[in-house]
Amino acid sequence: MRSLFYIAVAVAVFARSSAVAAFTNADDSQLLSKTTPDFATDAMASSDSRKRFLRATDPEDGDLQADDEERTKFKSLADIIKHLDDQDMKHVAGILANMDDIHHKNVLAKALESGRITQKNYDDAIAALQRTSK
């Protein structure tokens, strides 16, 4: 492994000395050796790390307020239901209020399809869910 490294270093040194010898003027060889560091400096200067923003902040769009967007977070499902009730979206609030029942019915349906429970057990569980939800 070391011999491979030494061969690579020797090839790099030989290639550099051959490129320097190819120039007739000594200033030209200095130009070649300065090309890479200046290029690296230019690349670093042009790739300034800029802070990225997800939303545009144009002063022309002053009419868009944060209240117009759905940025608010709610702590619980009860807060979401209350907020929907306030906005006269009773049907959506009803769906969210019955989300547990809907989930239980879906789980029971999957269990019935896979054969883990019988039709009688499924019917009994649905009847029990309807009694508890009233």
From Swiss-Prot:
It comes from the Eukaryota. This is RxLR effector protein 4. Disruption phenotype: Results in significantly reduced virulence on Nicotiana benthamiana. InterPro entries: RXLR. The RxLR-dEER motif acts to carry the protein into the host cell cytoplasm through binding to cell surface phosphatidylinositol-3-phosphate. Pfam families: RXLR. It is found in: Secreted. Residues 1-22 form the signal peptide. Its main location: secreted. Residues 48-58 have a biased composition (Basic and acidic residues). It comes from Phytophthora nicotianae (strain INRA-310) (Phytophthora parasitica). Effector that enhances plant susceptibility to P.parasitica in Nicotiana benthamiana and Arabidopsis thaliana. Triggers non-specific cell death in a variety of plants, including tobacco, tomato, potato and A.thaliana. E4-induced cell death is dependent on HSP90, NPK and SGT1, suggesting that PpE4 is recognized by the plant immune system. Induction: Expression is highly induced during the early stages of infection. GO terms for cellular component: extracellular region. A motif (RxLR-dEER) lies at residues 52-71. Belongs to the RxLR effector family. Residues 43-65 are annotated as: Disordered.
